Amino acid sequence: MAEKGITAPKGFVASATTAGIKASGNPDMALVVNQGPEFSAAAVFTRNRVFAAPVKVSRENVADGQIRAVLYNAGNANACNGLQGEKDARESVSHLAQNLGLEDSDIGVCSTGLIGELLPMDKLNAGIDQLTAEGALGDNGAAAAKAIMTTDTVDKETVVFADGWTVGGMGKGVGMMAPSLATMLVCLTTDASVTQEMAQIALANATAVTFDTLDIDGSTSTNDTVFLLASGASGITPTQDELNDAVYAACSDIAAKLQADAEGVTKRVAVTVVGTTNNEQAINAARTVARDNLFKCAMFGSDPNWGRVLAAVGMADADMEPEKISVFFNDKAVCLDSTGAPGAREVDLSGADIDVRIDLGTSGEGQATVRTTDLSFSYVEINSAYST
C-alpha cells in the first residue's frame, strides 16, 4: 500500500496513462477501482446549473449509493457539448464497465479541462484499454494524482490514519475556485466499513467547511465533483463522529494544497468575519472581501490597505454596524471602529500567509473563514492563455 493517496487504504488500486488528450503530452487519464468487499459511495457536485455531461452521469450512477470505479480524464471538460457530450460520457462509462466486468451504474466519470470541445473518443477509449490492461491496476495512486492535473503545478495527495482504518485522497484544481467546490476533482477512499448514509454525512459536512470556503477567483466550475468510496477492507466500523473527523482532515489538507497551488499565487489569505448575526451572513461577508479585486491586489502588493476591506465588506449581505467595524491583519489592528489605527500603514504583510480578521461590530455570534489568494500578474497571464 502507498504511504498516502487513494491507494493508501486497503481495497483500492489505480492506474494512469497518457492518451494524448492533453496538448502537452503529459499523462491525462486515471482510474480508481474499489476492490471491496464493500462498495459504499458518496458524492457532492457543482451547484452550477450549467454542469458538464460527466456530472450528470455520475449523479445518476451514485444515486444508489454504490460506485466501484471512477474514470478521470484531464485536458477536456466535456462540458457544454450538448447531447453528443452526454453520449460520449455514457460511451466511456460503458467501455470501462465492459473492460472491468461491471455494470454501467457502477462507474463514476470525471472530466476536467477546456469547456466546449468534444472529447476525442478514439483517444479516450484507447486510454481506457490502457488503464485496464493486464498489470496496469495497482499501487499507482501517485501516478493517478499527476494524471488529473491541468494548470496545477504539483499533484495533491493526502492520507489520514485512524484506529486501524485509513482515509486517502487526491485532488486537482488551481483556478475557477469559488463556493460550491472549485474547478476541482477530488477522490477520497477509505477502508472503513460504513454505510452510504454515513459516508454522505461525513462528506457533506467536510466539504461545507473546506472546499466550499475556498474562493480563489469567484468562478464556479461546471465539473466540480468529490467522491468518497468505502471498501470496508479494514473490517472496522468507526462512529459517525470518527468518520466525520477523518474525512474533514483529508478534505482540509487537500483544500490547503489547492490554495497553495492556486494559479499565480504569491499570498495565501484567510479572511475571517465575526460579529454578525449568523454564520451564513459571516460567510457572505468573508466571501465578498475574498472576491474583491482591489483587496486581492493589495494583498499581492503586501499593502495593509484596510480601506479596501471596509469598502468591500460594506457591500456584503450581512448585518453590521458601519461605524463599529474593526479590521486586523495578522492579529495587528489596522482599523478600529471604522477608523484607522495607529501604525496601520506599517504592518508587515511581506510573508506568504496573511490572516485578515473583520469584526462587523454587532456582537452577534456569526463567524466564518474563507480561504483565498492574491491577484498576481501570473494569474492574468495563465488565464489569458488558457483557451483555444
UniProtKB/Swiss-Prot annotation:
GO terms for biological process: L-arginine biosynthetic process; ornithine biosynthetic process. Belongs to the ArgJ family. The keyword Protein transport does not apply. HAMAP family: ArgJ. Keywords: Acyltransferase, Amino-acid biosynthesis, Arginine biosynthesis, Autocatalytic cleavage, Cytoplasm, Multifunctional enzyme, Transferase. It catalyses: N(2)-acetyl-L-ornithine + L-glutamate = N-acetyl-L-glutamate + L-ornithine; L-glutamate + acetyl-CoA = N-acetyl-L-glutamate + CoA + H(+). One of its GO terms (molecular function) is glutamate N-acetyltransferase activity. This is Arginine biosynthesis bifunctional protein ArgJ. Heterotetramer of two alpha and two beta chains. It is an enzyme of class 2 (transferase). InterPro entries: Arg_biosynth_ArgJ (IPR002813), ArgJ-like_dom_sf (IPR016117), ArgJ_beta_C (IPR042195). Substrate binds at T150, K172, T183, E263, N383, T388. Its EC number is 2.3.1.35, 2.3.1.1. It is found in: Cytoplasm. The lineage of its organism: Bacteria, Bacillati, Actinomycetota, Actinomycetes, Mycobacteriales. The active site is at T183 (nucleophile). The keyword Manganese does not apply. Catalyzes two activities which are involved in the cyclic version of arginine biosynthesis: the synthesis of N-acetylglutamate from glutamate and acetyl-CoA as the acetyl donor, and of ornithine by transacetylation between N(2)-acetylornithine and glutamate. The record marks A182, T183 as: Cleavage. One of its GO terms (cellular component) is cytoplasm. Pathway: Amino-acid biosynthesis; L-arginine biosynthesis; L-ornithine and N-acetyl-L-glutamate from L-glutamate and N(2)-acetyl-L-ornithine (cyclic): step 1/1; Amino-acid biosynthesis; L-arginine biosynthesis; N(2)-acetyl-L-ornithine from L-glutamate: step 1/4.
